[in-house]
């Protein structure tokens, strides 16, 4: 299987399956002498991990990360950093009854048609469980970016179903299980999730990520544009079906006189472009939105086919999220951080004195 790595100067490779013994990864390109401990990575892993609230999957993984290499006496050495996260609450027996059929909306069908064989235990490699290592790698990137350039990368739940969450207070995002910055919407979110859990259904979400203090000049025209790489990274997250940067699809109804970001000696008058012009960062905050589909692992019966090409019904058994978007926030932050640090290192290599 190809496609297990992302990045050029800062390169992340992951391995492992949902119900295998462990997940792991290798990070190449981390600059030396960055203070780093497992505690630095664990914070974001705890934000992502399942079983952390009654609103998410009750699979109870501690997601304890172990740094195997690349760190000595509390600092990075500049060599490859090896990471390991053991699976401690995997239950492959939950999938025995559905191993010979394809779960609609999942990668079961496409994986088997592509490879001729698949790991049916929770989706194997296609499971969002894989993203735990991405979050750990992203934590390394976030620490370097903040320490060296004061770059902040933060995300929040912008919408779940019909409930819209306004960015009122960043401080509240990590103080509630929804990553919601709008405390007035917590009751509505709670009601929505409770109703979904009772009905056995799920719902989609919109996540917003904002990267601040980005220096001007990150991005490599033409094919490695910063926005192209960000879209690539965000689309690689399980269940993401759409990416917007800046005004995104709302530009369809706007006039050029309205959308262009006019400039004065004091700076830009607006940020409709989302901080990127011509594929290169312009110094403004980079604003991204992603659409998360509702998980297909639900207890509502659905039509499907078996490996023997017979029609049947499926009712998903196991522990699943009524809204996977709740746990995507730290994953999206991680992917943005991985792209930003990669382009920062590329810029330093090519244009250090500029």
From Swiss-Prot:
The UniProt note on the cofactor reads as follows:
Reduced FMN (FMNH(2)).
Q: Which Gene3D superfamilies match?
A: Chorismate synthase AroC
**Domain of life assignment:** Bacteria
Checking Pfam families in the record gives: Chorismate_synt (PF01264)
Keywords from the UniProt entry: Amino-acid biosynthesis, Aromatic amino acid biosynthesis, FAD, Flavoprotein, FMN, Lyase, NADP
GO molecular function annotations of the record = chorismate synthase activity; FMN binding
From the UniProt record, give the pathway where this protein acts: Metabolic intermediate biosynthesis; chorismate biosynthesis; chorismate from D-erythrose 4-phosphate and phosphoenolpyruvate: step 7/7
The UniProt catalytic activity note for this protein reads: 5-O-(1-carboxyvinyl)-3-phosphoshikimate = chorismate + phosphate
Listed PANTHER family: CHORISMATE SYNTHASE
Q: How does it assemble?
A: Homotetramer.
Similarity section: Belongs to the chorismate synthase family.
According to its UniProt entry, the function of this protein is described as: This reaction introduces a second double bond into the aromatic ring system.
Name listed for the protein in its UniProt record = Chorismate synthase
Q: Say which species the protein is native to.
A: Blochmanniella pennsylvanica (strain BPEN)
